[in-house]
Regions:
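PLD/PLD-like phosphodiesterase catalytic module centered on the HKD motif
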Residues: 1-156
């Protein structure tokens, strides 16, 4: 049976979901500005070569997000226009929530969500997983790149 999550529980179970990923991790959020704790957890998944897919919907990624993502070889990013869904899942659990992967939201907003455990509610988990896969399919995979431009022209 699904479990209701308030703001603090949503943040807690999101961290647990990321930590618990053994094979794959899908993070779907319109806004993407990761806090240091989430980055640390994702870096660990990257080191373990876990397949991580992040789908976001607002194209204005900050330069520090771009640099960080470029350094993570097992984290793939996709852009999905008109994305409003927020869904986070691994092979065992899914969270459907109002919480964006946005540092401000995780600290300042009142959020809620639902935790779905595959073992407890296989059909609901399957439906959530399939919709997440559909969103991934309609998204454009983005190869993160950023070119540094010198603030002054170099003289020759």
């Amino acid at each position: 049976m699904a479990k209701f999550l308030n703001t603090s529980a949503t943040n807690y179970f999101l961290e647990e979901l990321i930590k618990g990923a053994q094979e794959r991790l899908v993070l779907i959020s319109p806004f993407l500005k990761l806090n240091d704790r989430i980055k640390e957890l994702l870096e660990d998944k990257n080191r373990l070569k876990i397949d991580v897919r992040i789908v976001y919907g607002k194209s204005e990624l900050q330069p520090q997000e771009i640099e960080w993502l470029k350094a993570q070889s097992y984290i793939r990013t996709s852009f999905c226009k008109n994305l409003h869904a927020k869904c986070y899942l691994n092979e065992e659990n899914a969270i459907v929530t109002s919480l964006n992967l946005y540092e401000f939201s995780q600290i300042n907003n009142n959020e809620m969500g639902i935790l779905i455990r595959r073992d407890d509610d296989a059909e609901l988990y399957k439906d959530t997983y399939e919709e997440a896969q559909r969103i991934i399919r309609i998204s454009d995979e983005v190869r993160i790149s950023m070119e540094r431009v010198s603030s002054t022209d170099s003289e020759t």
